[in-house]
Amino acid sequence: MVKAVAVLRGDSKISGTVTFEQADANAPTTVSWNITGHDANAERAFHVHQFGDNTNGCTSAGPHFNPFGKEHGAPEDENRHVGDLGNFKTDAEGNAVGSKQDKLIKLIGAESVLGRTLVIHAGTDDLGRSEHPESKKTGNAGARPACGVIGIAA
């Protein structure tokens, strides 16, 4: 079992953690989140981005992690970036707790997300389904108010 965590920080009141657990190289990864301080009663995007570089805030993380050269999509789509995690829902206080399993997110192997950045976005991911020019690249998910590098956890 490999475990990892991203501790979220940024230029906003958003904070929290996103954890990852993978039993072996062929197993799906469980992604769990506990996020506070976002917009109330909203769907907000989160993605794994290419770089673990946060020297200029979350913008330094680069584009979505996309080792297979696919278009942006929903987590359940065949054609999607590895880093496309979709949206999480916040409650009336702007907090979100949840988990999902993902077959493309890996902690083991050449396409591992370890050392990359988990980014929380200001907007909702359109899952690559709109006519907006950013839809097939970013899901038109907006600014990056919080992020954290994915590191190995105890």
UniProtKB/Swiss-Prot annotation:
It catalyses: 2 superoxide + 2 H(+) = H2O2 + O2. GO terms for cellular component: cytosol; mitochondrial intermembrane space; nucleus; superoxide dismutase complex. Its EC number is 1.15.1.1. It is an enzyme of class 1 (oxidoreductase). SUPFAM superfamilies: Cu,Zn superoxide dismutase-like. Substrate binds at residue 144. PROSITE patterns: SOD_CU_ZN_1, SOD_CU_ZN_2. It is found in: Cytoplasm. Binds 1 copper ion per subunit. Binds 1 zinc ion per subunit. Zn(2+) binds at residues 64, 72, 81, 84. Disulfide bonds join 58-147. CDD domains: Cu-Zn_Superoxide_Dismutase (cd00305). InterPro entries: SOD-like_Cu/Zn_dom_sf, SOD_Cu/Zn_/chaperone, SOD_Cu/Zn_BS, SOD_Cu_Zn_dom. Its main location: cytoplasm. Its cofactor is Cu cation; Zn(2+). Pfam families: Sod_Cu. One of its GO terms (molecular function) is copper ion binding. Cu cation binds at residues 47, 49, 64, 121. Residues 125-137 have a biased composition (Basic and acidic residues). Belongs to the Cu-Zn superoxide dismutase family. Destroys radicals which are normally produced within the cells and which are toxic to biological systems. Homodimer. This is Superoxide dismutase [Cu-Zn]. It comes from Aspergillus oryzae (strain ATCC 42149 / RIB 40) (Yellow koji mold). The lineage of its organism: Eukaryota, Fungi, Dikarya, Ascomycota, Pezizomycotina.
